[in-house]
Amino acid sequence: MVKLLLLILLSGSSLFLNAQDFIPFWPEGKMPNTKGMKLKDSIANERIYQVGTPGMYAYFPSKQENKGAAVLICPGGGYERLAYVISGIQLAKWLNSIGISAFVLNYRLPNSPDLIEREKGPLQDAQRAIRYIHTHANEWGIKQDKIGIQGSSAGGHLASQAGSINADFSAIGDSLDKVSFVPDFMILVSPVIDMGIYAHKGSRKNLLGENLADKLIKQYSTQLQVNAKTPPAFIIHASNDQSVNPQNSILFYQALLEKKVSASLHIFPQGGHALAIRNNPGSANAWTNLCEEWMIEMGFIPESLSK
Protein backbone atom coordinates (compact mmCIF):
# COMPACT_ATOMS: atom_id res chain seq x y z
CA MET A 1 0.00 0.00 0.00
CA VAL A 2 2.83 2.40 0.85
CA LYS A 3 4.52 1.72 -2.49
CA LEU A 4 1.25 2.19 -4.36
CA LEU A 5 0.55 5.49 -2.60
CA LEU A 6 4.09 6.65 -3.38
CA LEU A 7 3.59 5.88 -7.07
CA ILE A 8 0.40 7.91 -7.06
CA LEU A 9 2.05 10.86 -5.35
CA LEU A 10 4.94 10.79 -7.80
CA SER A 11 2.82 10.46 -10.90
CA GLY A 12 0.19 13.02 -9.88
CA SER A 13 -2.36 11.13 -11.93
CA SER A 14 -4.97 9.15 -9.99
CA LEU A 15 -5.87 10.95 -6.78
CA PHE A 16 -8.27 8.54 -5.15
CA LEU A 17 -7.47 4.88 -4.66
CA ASN A 18 -11.09 3.92 -4.11
CA ALA A 19 -12.87 6.30 -6.46
CA GLN A 20 -15.23 4.70 -8.96
CA ASP A 21 -14.72 7.19 -11.78
CA PHE A 22 -13.12 10.57 -12.36
CA ILE A 23 -15.35 12.87 -14.39
CA PRO A 24 -13.82 15.99 -15.96
CA PHE A 25 -16.74 18.33 -16.62
CA TRP A 26 -15.18 21.11 -18.71
CA PRO A 27 -14.86 20.39 -22.46
CA GLU A 28 -11.38 20.77 -23.90
CA GLY A 29 -10.62 24.45 -24.49
CA LYS A 30 -13.93 25.61 -22.96
CA MET A 31 -13.06 26.03 -19.27
CA PRO A 32 -13.73 29.64 -18.20
CA ASN A 33 -11.42 31.88 -16.17
CA THR A 34 -8.18 30.29 -17.37
CA LYS A 35 -4.89 31.56 -18.76
CA GLY A 36 -4.46 28.32 -20.66
CA MET A 37 -1.69 26.92 -18.48
CA LYS A 38 -1.18 23.15 -18.23
CA LEU A 39 -0.98 22.23 -14.54
CA LYS A 40 -0.38 18.94 -12.78
CA ASP A 41 -2.04 17.69 -9.63
CA SER A 42 0.07 18.24 -6.51
CA ILE A 43 -0.65 15.96 -3.52
CA ALA A 44 0.94 15.50 -0.10
CA ASN A 45 -0.30 14.10 3.23
CA GLU A 46 -3.81 13.40 1.94
CA ARG A 47 -4.13 16.99 0.74
CA ILE A 48 -4.35 18.35 -2.80
CA TYR A 49 -2.40 21.59 -3.18
CA GLN A 50 -2.85 22.12 -6.91
CA VAL A 51 -5.60 20.86 -9.19
CA GLY A 52 -4.56 20.05 -12.72
CA THR A 53 -7.94 19.00 -14.09
CA PRO A 54 -11.14 20.12 -12.36
CA GLY A 55 -13.72 17.38 -12.11
CA MET A 56 -15.39 15.07 -9.66
CA TYR A 57 -14.98 11.55 -8.35
CA ALA A 58 -18.20 9.54 -8.47
CA TYR A 59 -19.31 7.14 -5.75
CA PHE A 60 -22.53 5.23 -6.35
CA PRO A 61 -24.57 3.00 -4.03
CA SER A 62 -25.81 -0.33 -5.31
CA LYS A 63 -28.90 -0.25 -7.50
CA GLN A 64 -30.81 -2.07 -4.77
CA GLU A 65 -29.93 0.55 -2.14
CA ASN A 66 -30.12 3.64 -4.36
CA LYS A 67 -32.61 6.19 -2.99
CA GLY A 68 -32.47 8.55 -5.94
CA ALA A 69 -30.62 11.43 -4.26
CA ALA A 70 -27.13 12.80 -4.86
CA VAL A 71 -24.73 15.07 -3.00
CA LEU A 72 -21.81 17.04 -4.42
CA ILE A 73 -19.08 17.13 -1.76
CA CYS A 74 -16.79 20.17 -1.52
CA PRO A 75 -13.69 19.25 0.53
CA GLY A 76 -12.34 21.81 2.98
CA GLY A 77 -8.82 23.10 3.38
CA GLY A 78 -8.96 26.86 3.82
CA TYR A 79 -9.04 27.48 0.04
CA GLU A 80 -5.35 26.53 0.11
CA ARG A 81 -5.69 22.76 -0.29
CA LEU A 82 -8.35 20.06 -0.51
CA ALA A 83 -8.59 17.64 2.43
CA TYR A 84 -9.98 15.00 0.11
CA VAL A 85 -10.02 12.07 2.57
CA ILE A 86 -11.54 13.35 5.82
CA SER A 87 -13.88 15.84 4.10
CA GLY A 88 -14.29 13.96 0.85
CA ILE A 89 -13.95 10.19 0.55
CA GLN A 90 -15.17 9.43 4.07
CA LEU A 91 -18.31 11.50 3.53
CA ALA A 92 -18.91 9.88 0.15
CA LYS A 93 -18.76 6.40 1.66
CA TRP A 94 -21.16 7.39 4.43
CA LEU A 95 -23.62 8.79 1.88
CA ASN A 96 -23.35 5.58 -0.16
CA SER A 97 -24.12 3.59 3.00
CA ILE A 98 -27.49 5.34 3.26
CA GLY A 99 -28.25 4.96 -0.45
CA ILE A 100 -27.13 8.37 -1.75
CA SER A 101 -24.87 8.92 -4.75
CA ALA A 102 -21.87 11.11 -3.94
CA PHE A 103 -19.48 13.17 -6.02
CA VAL A 104 -16.25 14.51 -4.51
CA LEU A 105 -15.45 17.82 -6.19
CA ASN A 106 -11.89 18.44 -7.33
CA TYR A 107 -12.17 22.22 -7.63
CA ARG A 108 -9.61 24.81 -8.66
CA LEU A 109 -8.01 26.57 -5.73
CA PRO A 110 -7.81 30.38 -5.70
CA ASN A 111 -4.00 30.29 -5.55
CA SER A 112 -3.83 28.52 -8.91
CA PRO A 113 -1.48 30.43 -11.24
CA ASP A 114 -3.87 29.62 -14.09
CA LEU A 115 -6.85 31.57 -12.73
CA ILE A 116 -7.62 35.04 -14.04
CA GLU A 117 -10.10 35.88 -11.26
CA ARG A 118 -9.07 33.84 -8.23
CA GLU A 119 -12.28 34.18 -6.26
CA LYS A 120 -14.51 32.84 -9.05
CA GLY A 121 -12.72 29.57 -9.85
CA PRO A 122 -14.14 27.34 -7.08
CA LEU A 123 -17.74 28.44 -7.64
CA GLN A 124 -17.47 28.02 -11.40
CA ASP A 125 -16.41 24.42 -10.89
CA ALA A 126 -19.18 23.75 -8.35
CA GLN A 127 -21.86 25.21 -10.62
CA ARG A 128 -20.62 23.18 -13.59
CA ALA A 129 -20.55 19.99 -11.50
CA ILE A 130 -24.17 20.46 -10.43
CA ARG A 131 -25.18 21.01 -14.04
CA TYR A 132 -23.29 17.89 -15.08
CA ILE A 133 -25.03 15.77 -12.43
CA HIS A 134 -28.41 17.08 -13.59
CA THR A 135 -27.56 16.21 -17.19
CA HIS A 136 -26.69 12.61 -16.32
CA ALA A 137 -29.21 12.15 -13.51
CA ASN A 138 -31.45 9.71 -15.37
CA GLU A 139 -28.66 7.30 -16.30
CA TRP A 140 -27.29 7.43 -12.75
CA GLY A 141 -30.66 6.84 -11.09
CA ILE A 142 -30.83 10.31 -9.56
CA LYS A 143 -33.98 12.41 -9.30
CA GLN A 144 -33.68 15.91 -10.71
CA ASP A 145 -35.04 17.61 -7.59
CA LYS A 146 -32.85 15.74 -5.10
CA ILE A 147 -29.35 16.96 -5.93
CA GLY A 148 -27.71 18.54 -2.90
CA ILE A 149 -24.33 19.95 -1.98
CA GLN A 150 -22.15 19.41 1.08
CA GLY A 151 -19.12 21.30 2.31
CA SER A 152 -16.83 21.30 5.33
CA SER A 153 -14.98 24.41 6.56
CA ALA A 154 -13.94 26.40 3.46
CA GLY A 155 -15.77 23.76 1.44
CA GLY A 156 -18.83 24.82 3.42
CA HIS A 157 -18.29 28.35 2.18
CA LEU A 158 -18.20 27.08 -1.39
CA ALA A 159 -21.34 25.00 -0.81
CA SER A 160 -23.12 28.00 0.71
CA GLN A 161 -22.08 30.10 -2.30
CA ALA A 162 -23.56 27.52 -4.63
CA GLY A 163 -26.82 27.70 -2.71
CA SER A 164 -27.07 31.45 -2.23
CA ILE A 165 -25.46 33.16 -5.23
CA ASN A 166 -27.85 33.33 -8.18
CA ALA A 167 -25.36 34.69 -10.71
CA ASP A 168 -24.28 32.18 -13.36
CA PHE A 169 -20.47 32.04 -13.46
CA SER A 170 -20.21 28.74 -15.31
CA ALA A 171 -21.97 29.36 -18.63
CA ILE A 172 -19.78 28.49 -21.62
CA GLY A 173 -22.29 28.44 -24.47
CA ASP A 174 -23.05 24.71 -24.52
CA SER A 175 -26.18 22.68 -23.80
CA LEU A 176 -25.51 22.60 -20.04
CA ASP A 177 -26.12 26.35 -19.84
CA LYS A 178 -29.85 25.57 -19.83
CA VAL A 179 -29.55 23.25 -16.83
CA SER A 180 -29.92 24.38 -13.20
CA PHE A 181 -26.70 25.12 -11.30
CA VAL A 182 -28.41 25.59 -7.92
CA PRO A 183 -28.48 22.65 -5.45
CA ASP A 184 -31.74 21.42 -3.95
CA PHE A 185 -30.34 21.29 -0.41
CA MET A 186 -27.17 22.06 1.55
CA ILE A 187 -25.29 20.16 4.25
CA LEU A 188 -22.77 22.47 5.92
CA VAL A 189 -20.18 21.18 8.40
CA SER A 190 -18.29 23.82 10.43
CA PRO A 191 -18.68 26.19 7.48
CA VAL A 192 -16.83 29.39 6.74
CA ILE A 193 -19.59 31.89 5.95
CA ASP A 194 -18.61 35.43 6.92
CA MET A 195 -15.79 37.38 5.27
CA GLY A 196 -16.06 40.23 7.77
CA ILE A 197 -15.67 40.27 11.56
CA TYR A 198 -16.11 36.50 12.02
CA ALA A 199 -14.04 35.49 9.01
CA HIS A 200 -11.60 32.63 9.04
CA LYS A 201 -8.70 34.84 8.04
CA GLY A 202 -6.79 32.16 6.17
CA SER A 203 -9.76 31.26 3.98
CA ARG A 204 -10.52 34.92 3.34
CA LYS A 205 -6.94 35.71 2.36
CA ASN A 206 -6.66 32.67 0.11
CA LEU A 207 -9.96 33.38 -1.62
CA LEU A 208 -9.93 37.16 -1.92
CA GLY A 209 -6.26 38.08 -1.63
CA GLU A 210 -4.60 40.79 0.45
CA ASN A 211 -6.47 43.88 -0.73
CA LEU A 212 -9.97 43.49 0.64
CA ALA A 213 -12.53 45.84 -0.85
CA ASP A 214 -15.82 46.20 1.05
CA LYS A 215 -17.66 45.10 -2.08
CA LEU A 216 -15.80 41.79 -2.17
CA ILE A 217 -16.28 41.18 1.55
CA LYS A 218 -20.03 41.68 1.21
CA GLN A 219 -20.25 39.67 -2.00
CA TYR A 220 -18.52 36.65 -0.47
CA SER A 221 -20.13 36.82 2.98
CA THR A 222 -22.74 34.29 2.02
CA GLN A 223 -25.18 35.15 4.81
CA LEU A 224 -25.69 38.41 2.90
CA GLN A 225 -26.47 36.53 -0.32
CA VAL A 226 -29.25 34.33 1.07
CA ASN A 227 -32.52 34.87 -0.78
CA ALA A 228 -35.97 33.34 -1.07
CA LYS A 229 -34.67 30.84 -3.66
CA THR A 230 -31.85 29.57 -1.43
CA PRO A 231 -32.38 25.83 -0.77
CA PRO A 232 -32.93 24.28 2.69
CA ALA A 233 -29.87 23.70 4.84
CA PHE A 234 -28.66 21.31 7.53
CA ILE A 235 -25.85 22.98 9.49
CA ILE A 236 -23.56 21.69 12.24
CA HIS A 237 -20.79 23.35 14.23
CA ALA A 238 -18.98 22.92 17.55
CA SER A 239 -19.07 25.58 20.25
CA ASN A 240 -15.37 25.10 20.92
CA ASP A 241 -14.27 25.48 17.29
CA GLN A 242 -11.15 27.65 17.57
CA SER A 243 -10.57 27.85 13.81
CA VAL A 244 -13.95 28.86 12.40
CA ASN A 245 -16.14 30.77 14.84
CA PRO A 246 -19.57 29.12 15.26
CA GLN A 247 -21.07 32.56 14.66
CA ASN A 248 -20.54 31.74 10.97
CA SER A 249 -23.18 29.02 11.14
CA ILE A 250 -25.44 31.15 13.31
CA LEU A 251 -25.31 34.05 10.85
CA PHE A 252 -26.21 31.80 7.94
CA TYR A 253 -29.02 30.15 9.89
CA GLN A 254 -30.46 33.54 10.87
CA ALA A 255 -30.30 34.71 7.25
CA LEU A 256 -32.20 31.60 6.15
CA LEU A 257 -34.87 32.21 8.78
CA GLU A 258 -35.25 35.83 7.68
CA LYS A 259 -35.90 34.66 4.11
CA LYS A 260 -38.24 31.92 5.35
CA VAL A 261 -35.96 29.16 4.07
CA SER A 262 -36.19 25.89 6.00
CA ALA A 263 -33.06 25.22 8.05
CA SER A 264 -31.77 22.97 10.82
CA LEU A 265 -28.85 24.11 13.00
CA HIS A 266 -27.01 21.94 15.54
CA ILE A 267 -24.20 23.41 17.63
CA PHE A 268 -22.49 20.77 19.74
CA PRO A 269 -20.48 21.55 22.91
CA GLN A 270 -17.41 19.61 21.76
CA GLY A 271 -15.75 18.74 18.48
CA GLY A 272 -13.52 21.70 17.73
CA HIS A 273 -12.79 22.10 14.05
CA ALA A 274 -12.65 18.36 13.54
CA LEU A 275 -16.27 17.29 13.09
CA ALA A 276 -16.21 14.44 10.60
CA ILE A 277 -17.67 11.00 10.01
CA ARG A 278 -15.61 9.28 12.70
CA ASN A 279 -14.40 9.85 16.25
CA ASN A 280 -16.62 12.80 17.16
CA PRO A 281 -16.85 13.50 20.90
CA GLY A 282 -20.05 13.17 22.89
CA SER A 283 -23.30 14.24 21.27
CA ALA A 284 -21.51 15.39 18.11
CA ASN A 285 -21.26 11.73 17.17
CA ALA A 286 -24.99 11.81 16.40
CA TRP A 287 -24.74 14.34 13.59
CA THR A 288 -24.84 11.85 10.72
CA ASN A 289 -28.01 10.23 12.09
CA LEU A 290 -29.55 13.67 12.55
CA CYS A 291 -28.62 14.59 8.99
CA GLU A 292 -30.12 11.40 7.57
CA GLU A 293 -33.35 11.99 9.52
CA TRP A 294 -33.42 15.58 8.26
CA MET A 295 -33.12 14.41 4.64
CA ILE A 296 -36.02 12.01 5.27
CA GLU A 297 -38.08 14.74 6.95
CA MET A 298 -37.47 17.11 4.03
CA GLY A 299 -38.37 14.46 1.47
CA PHE A 300 -34.95 14.15 -0.16
CA ILE A 301 -34.71 10.43 0.62
CA PRO A 302 -37.58 8.03 1.31
CA GLU A 303 -38.20 6.81 4.83
CA SER A 304 -39.25 3.33 3.74
CA LEU A 305 -35.81 2.47 2.33
CA SER A 306 -33.83 3.86 5.25
CA LYS A 307 -34.98 1.36 7.88
Predicted region positions:
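Short beta-strand element of the alpha/beta-hydrolase
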Residues: 67-76
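Short beta-strand/loop motif that positions the catalytic acidic residue
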Residues: 235-237, 241
